[in-house]
Amino acid sequence: PKEKREAKLSYDPVGWHNYKFYYGDGSKEAWLMNRGHLVGYQFSGLTDEGRNLVPMTAWLNTGAFTGTDDKNQSSMLYYENGLDSWLANHPNYYLDYKVTAVYKDNELIPRQIILQYVGIDQDGNLLEIKLGSSKEKIDKYSVTHVALDNVSANAEINYADGTAKNT
């Protein structure tokens, strides 16, 4: 997308609750949850779109309790930035990218986010993409699979109803 995305999201995904919890040594507070994009704005252009938003911990979404840490391999941001760089470095190639929220039974909050990605060259050949994460597993078709847990070290999450307790 050429336009900057909206600064604030207003859509509340199913199961949405938010809590300001203490973290670290207990002297700082941060919001536990984000309205997390399954497919990042830089790839989809979707911002406040319900079909693309789920409750994600800030840790899963941005890699940090506050701010961002795109070096955190347990975060969506690590893979989104890595894939965005891969596309920038391969302007004549395509990215096939699938993101799946994984729920157990009738839970409202996803327990995991599964990423699958592969490059495609001008001739339609599949190209392995390895971003350097220990979480990446590549299958026989060159598709990379990553499973990310929707957790936070400072919280116990009730995935069935979206509530949480500070730990």
PLM feature spans:
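Domain-level detector of nuclease and nuclease-like folds
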Residues: 1-167
